[in-house]
Swiss-Prot record:
Keywords: Heme, Hydrogen peroxide, Iron, Metal-binding, Oxidoreductase, Peroxidase, Peroxisome. It comes from Zea mays (Maize). Pfam families: Catalase, Catalase-rel. Gene3D superfamilies: Catalase core domain. This is Catalase isozyme 1. It is found in: Peroxisome. Belongs to the catalase family. Homotetramer. InterPro entries: Catalase, Catalase_AS, Catalase_clade1/3, Catalase_core, Catalase_haem_BS, Catalase_immune_responsive, Catalase_sf. Its cofactor is heme. The gene is CAT1. Transmembrane segments: none annotated. The active site is at 65, 138. One of its GO terms (biological process) is response to xenobiotic stimulus. Occurs in almost all aerobically respiring organisms and serves to protect cells from the toxic effects of hydrogen peroxide.
Length: 492
């Protein structure tokens, strides 16, 4: 064994206790002292090392998606999509790719109950032959905002009050009263699907718009959808209180126990695609992350299935240290000009470097399974064994060359630089359509959740008037019922 290439793991455990450097430890129960009752000696290196390691076990918590659980499995192509993309892992039916998935809540801290009303993260890392592909989404198909400039403020509004350290509805109501594009997302969050039964019984969505490119270089805008084969199930508010009071990690436990018992969760992957020549034919902007693409106009197309059949071996290594980023893609799956996606491309990688260090992609759970080569050297916690003499490019001493170019069609950009909003905001139509799709009992529960939010003592009459105006523009009947329950007169 080459000791310079050896990576410590549980597979190399010795039969006796050692220090981190491998020295034998003959007593792991007592500190080194002067006699039986004397002071502890600083020279007890094993004690110092043990305490220092313990003091540094925790790493910075994720700003969002702190509470989560991961599982491993595979993705298998079931339908031919080669006419849409030449991505290698989608090349033909039957092709399988290893994956790891992390499910999560979004706003709340690492130890919070998994029964809180909150979006759920649904992030998939594909270990393909052309590098990793991170499809980083949620269990809801839309988002609160369409421009990443607002993201830090939005998260601050959802997070606890910096003075009281309490999450308070008045802050959420106040912030989003300035952002009517959030209404569609709230028809999901304040709907029954706002609290999934567990991770196995929820959908997943790529949320953002991406671009697929085929061998001829023709692009299509695309959205990704995960559908659970066991169906979608949710918890009502009173059920969530009961479940959360019994086990605050119920979703993590359910996922782990199901896989351990051989009841492997499975999702079908579907896509929706739009030809770039048709993107102006709708009453919404296909790059607007606050909108869904109507399935009666843009039907779902089956692609494959994902099965999770293995639990993680170590929660910290494969759940806390796993890092996702929408920028991590593969040839023939490209970004679109979706404003939120464009900002996520930077922000996700940046937060991982803060949380895990500049070499976070070397961690086994994040590293590609395929061969890879570059001149990204050194930095904190770089544990890659390298012995080459040439660390620049190009060189006649290094045979590495440029990869084959992916056929990404050029786009001519000629407009003026400006900070602006999109033209087709259309903030109310889809929110109203979704509300009207609810049965009466479901509508009533939706209204009651808004009544609860708008009756917070810090919510002002102006706030209530604005929200009633918004919901009235979504649905006239909703605009009448909400003020009636609030004992207010509707503004329109």
């Amino acid at each position: 064994m080459d000791p310079y290439k050896h990576r410590p793991s549980s597979g190399s455990n010795s039969s006796f206790w050692t220090t981190n450097s491998g020295a034998p430890v003959w007593n792991n129960n007592s500190a080194l002292t002067v006699g039986q009752r004397g002071p502890i000696l600083l020279e007890d290196y094993h004690l110092i090392e043990k305490l220092a390691q313990f003091d540094r076990e925790r790493i910075p918590e994720r700003v969002v998606h702190a509470r989560g659980a991961s599982a491993k499995g595979f993705f298998e192509v079931t339908h031919d999509v080669s006419h849409l993309t030449c991505a290698d892992f989608l090349r033909a039916p039957g092709v399988q790719t290893p994956v790891i998935v992390r499910f999560s809540t979004v706003v709340h801290e690492r130890g919070s109950p998994e029964t809180l009303r909150d979006p759920r993260g649904f992030a998939v890392k594909f270990y393909t032959r052309e590098g990793n592909f991170d499809l980083v989404g949620n269990n809801m198909p839309v988002f609160f905002i369409r421009d990443g400039m607002k993201f830090p403020d939005m998260v601050h509004a959802f997070k606890p009050n910096p003075k009281t350290n309490l999450q308070e509805n008045w802050r959420i109501v106040d912030f989003f009263s300035h952002h009517p594009e959030s209404l569609h997302m709230f028809t999901f969050l304040f709907d029954d699907v706002g609290i999934p039964l567990n991770y196995r019984h929820m959908e997943g969505f790529g949320v953002n718009t991406y671009s697929l490119i085929n061998r001829d270089g023709k692009p299509h805008l695309v959205k990704f959808h995960w559908k659970p084969t066991c169906g979608v199930k949710c918890l009502l508010d009173n059920e969530a209180v009961t479940v959360g009071g019994t086990c605050h990690s119920h979703a993590t436990k359910d996922l782990y126990d199901s896989i351990a018992a051989g009841n492997y969760p499975e999702w079908k992957l579907y896509i929706q695609t739009i030809d770039l020549d048709h993107e102006d034919k709708f009453d919404f902007d296909p790059l607007d992350v606050t909108k869904t693409w109507p399935e009666d106009i843009i039907p779902l197309q089956p692609v494959g299935r994902m099965v999770l059949n293995k639990n993680v071996d170590n929660f910290f290594a494969e759940n806390e240290q796993i890092a996702f980023c929408p920028a991590i893609s593969v040839p023939a799956i490209h970004y679109s000009d979706d404003k939120l996606l464009q900002t996520r491309i930077f922000s996700y990688a940046d937060t991982q470097r803060h949380r895990l260090g500049p070499n976070y992609l070397m961690l086994p759970v994040n590293a590609p399974k395929c061969a890879h080569h570059n001149n990204h050297h050194d930095g904190f916690m770089n544990f890659m064994h390298r012995d080459e003499e040439v660390n620049y490019f190009p060189s006649r001493f290094d045979p590495a060359r440029h990869a084959e170019k992916v056929p990404i069609p050029p786009r001519v950009l000629t407009r003026c630089r400006e900070k602006c909003i999109i033209q087709k905001e259309n903030n109310f139509k889809q929110a109203g359509e979704r509300y009207r799709s609810f049965d009466p009992a479901r509508q009533d529960r939706f209204i009651q959740r808004w009544v609860d939010a708008l009756t917070h003592p810090r919510v002002t009459h102006e706030h209530r008037t604005i929200w009633i105006s918004y919901w009235s523009q979504c649905d006239a009947a909703l605009g009448q019922k909400l003020p009636s329950r609030l004992n207010l007169k509707p503004s329109m």
